[in-house]
Each structure stands twice: as structure tokens, then as C-alpha cells.
């Protein structure tokens, strides 16, 4: 396993993968809010943008005072300065993955960063 790490994630309220996967360029968390619950604080970041993928359920994010409805299959990017808080719907929980990376750090991606072996 010199070139990869693998973990299994339980259905906990929040699991951070930085240490579990020995990540060096990102933080990834798996989040589950039950119906009617919310993240108990508003937050922002100094340097990192966040990308969210809703894997199940529904809810909303309030970003800089604006409500964004969320459902399974939605993707959402929030810049570092965006003040955000997440809420599950009253009648259904929400599960999502959050990927946190330094804003404007991506120099190459997809084919530009790949080496193809024949």
C-alpha cells in the first residue's frame, strides 16, 4: 500500500478523512445530519474553498444569508469567505461529502496532470 490508502467509513455524524487517508492536499469529510438537525455554527475559511456533494436526503445551506435548497445529487462550491451553515430538512436527514482544498491552487488537472502508460 505504498501508493494508496483505503478506509471504510461508518454512518457517524461526521468522519474526517485527513488523518485516516494521510491526505496532503485536501481535507474530506463525510457528514450525516438527521431530520431537523443542523451544523451548530456558521463558519468560513481563510484560504480553502469547499465542494459539497449531497449523497442522500435533502436540506439547505444558508450562505451569506441566502438559502440554497439541497437534495441528493446536488453539487455546491463555496468560496472561502462565504459564511455557511447546513440544515437537514424537518422531515428527512441529509448526507453529504465535503472536499476542502486551497482556492486557486489547481495548476493542472485531468489529462494535463495524467501520465498514460502503453
Per-region residue spans from a language model:
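Ligand-binding loop in jelly-roll beta-barrel domains
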Residues: 80-106
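Short strand-coil-strand connectors
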Residues: 24, 62-66
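Short acidic-glycine-tyrosine-enriched beta hairpin
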Residues: 65-81
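Short histidine-centered beta-strand/loop micro-motifs
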Residues: 19-20, 40-45, 87-89, 108-109
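Conserved hydrophobic/aromatic positions in well-ordered beta-strands
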Residues: 29-31, 97
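Histidine-centered metal-chelating micro-motifs
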Residues: 38-39, 60, 76, 81-86
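A short, N-terminal "cap"/entry segment at the start of jelly-roll beta-barrel domains
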Residues: 1-26, 34-35, 107-118
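Short, conserved beta-strand element in jelly-roll/cupin
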Residues: 32-33, 44-62
